[in-house]
């Protein structure tokens, strides 16, 4: 059942992720190009202005059940986060991020965790964490960034649990 739920949530996350990544690429292509590792001073990456993106994402996220968004450049450096996340400029060495930099999409389901800060949007929620490559234009072209998306799947889990009780 968890494998099926993971597949379903990955498909939901992929759909939401592509909508978001297309918006990011279409409306912030210049920033993404500047954030890529091609000859850019890493210190410049930390001062890029994504305030318009942040405002837009925060307004859209609730309608598609997205809890958090992170954006990494093509070297795995965190360059954008919606809220309450690690400092920009930090490198992420997770396997899922490295795979996304190579074009692979991955999703992991996470149960509510008491260790999560109560102020965090993840607190008390089941969520699916998905890493998606952001391409320059269309899939198959150069990967310019990776989008890490946290989708609230609490309602789906509750629905599956109620169906399991019936059977």
Where are these regions (language model features)?
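Amphipathic alpha-helical regulatory segments at dimerization interfaces
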Residues: 23, 54-63, 96-100
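Extracellular/periplasmic ligand-binding regions of membrane signal-transduction receptors
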Residues: 13-52, 74-79
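A short, hydrophobic, proline-anchored segment that marks a local hinge/packing element in signaling
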Residues: 129-141
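Helix-start (N-cap) segments at beta->loop->alpha junctions
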Residues: 112-116, 135-136, 148-165
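N-terminal membrane-insertion alpha helix
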Residues: 1-14
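Extracytoplasmic/periplasmic sensor domains and loops in membrane signaling proteins
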Residues: 46-50, 83-125
């Amino acid at each position: 059942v968890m494998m099926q739920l993971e597949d379903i949530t990955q498909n939901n996350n992929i759909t939401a992720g592509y909508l978001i990544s297309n918006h990011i690429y279409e409306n912030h292509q210049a920033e993404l190009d500047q954030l890529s590792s091609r000859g850019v001073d890493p210190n410049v990456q930390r001062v890029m202005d994504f305030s318009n993106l942040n405002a837009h994402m925060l307004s859209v996220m609730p309608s598609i059940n997205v809890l958090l968004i992170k954006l990494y450049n093509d070297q795995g450096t965190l360059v954008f986060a919606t809220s309450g996340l690690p400092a920009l400029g930090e490198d992420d060495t997770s396997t899922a991020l490295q795979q996304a930099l190579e074009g692979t999409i991955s999703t992991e389901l996470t149960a509510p965790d008491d260790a999560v800060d109560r102020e965090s949007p993840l607190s008390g929620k089941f969520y699916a964490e998905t890493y998606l490559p952001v391409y320059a234009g269309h899939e198959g072209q150069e990967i310019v960034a990776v989008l890490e998306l946290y989708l609230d799947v609490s309602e789906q889990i509750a629905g599956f649990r109620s169906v399991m009780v019936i059977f």
